[in-house]
Amino acid sequence: MEVILLERVAKLGQMGETVNVRPGYARNFLLARGKALRATENNKKHFEAQRAQLEARNLERRNEAQTVAEKLDGQSFVLIRQSGETGVLYGSVSTRDLAEVVTKEGFTVERGQFVLNQPIKTLGLHTVPVTLHPEVEVKVTVNIARSPEEAERQARGESVTEREQFNLDDLGLEVGQALADAGEGADDRG
């Protein structure tokens, strides 16, 4: 199915281009979201008549996205989640969670603007791309931790998933004596 793009669509084309796409993609995504028109003669004439307005609207949206991008680029956000000893989360962090935390900080970002190939399932610092406009993309850092103190440690670069190493001798026990005492107790029971 041939469609006329009303805005830039990633991996497809620029505004005003006539492209051939599968009918399902056209109906369910491009046409439904107002990103394209069917490429009929009437629509082509209508598009050419409205082209200046569409380009002005697109430029305005891009400028708005650019101002938000200047404030948002490089920002770091903290999410507190429960996890196991190894740092694997109980559950995961999705685009909905990211949109909530960024919105609480005063930015207007929708969940569809975050680019995640799969949900985040581990503690740590994660860099997430945010597409504010088809031509404007920024990266934010998400710090996922079990507590605010742990988030601060992660931000400094410390690993929070390593288990604390300790030495039995540091605990004030003599290992040889403790093992010998345990062995004598076993002989008494036998």
Curated annotation (Swiss-Prot):
Gene3D superfamilies: Ribosomal protein L9, C-terminal domain (3.10.430.100), Ribosomal protein L9, N-terminal domain (3.40.5.10). One of its GO terms (biological process) is translation. SUPFAM superfamilies: L9 N-domain-like, Ribosomal protein L9 C-domain. Pfam families: Ribosomal_L9_C (PF03948), Ribosomal_L9_N (PF01281). The keyword Kinase does not apply. It comes from the Bacteria. InterPro entries: Ribosomal_bL9, Ribosomal_bL9/RNase_H1_N, Ribosomal_bL9_bac/chp, Ribosomal_bL9_C, Ribosomal_bL9_C_sf, Ribosomal_bL9_N, Ribosomal_bL9_N_sf. GO terms for molecular function: rRNA binding; structural constituent of ribosome. Disulfide bonds: none annotated. One of its GO terms (cellular component) is ribosome. Keywords: Ribonucleoprotein, Ribosomal protein, RNA-binding, rRNA-binding. The keyword Transmembrane does not apply. Belongs to the bacterial ribosomal protein bL9 family. Binds to the 23S rRNA. NCBIfam families: L9 (TIGR00158). This is Large ribosomal subunit protein bL9. It comes from Methylorubrum populi (strain ATCC BAA-705 / NCIMB 13946 / BJ001) (Methylobacterium populi).
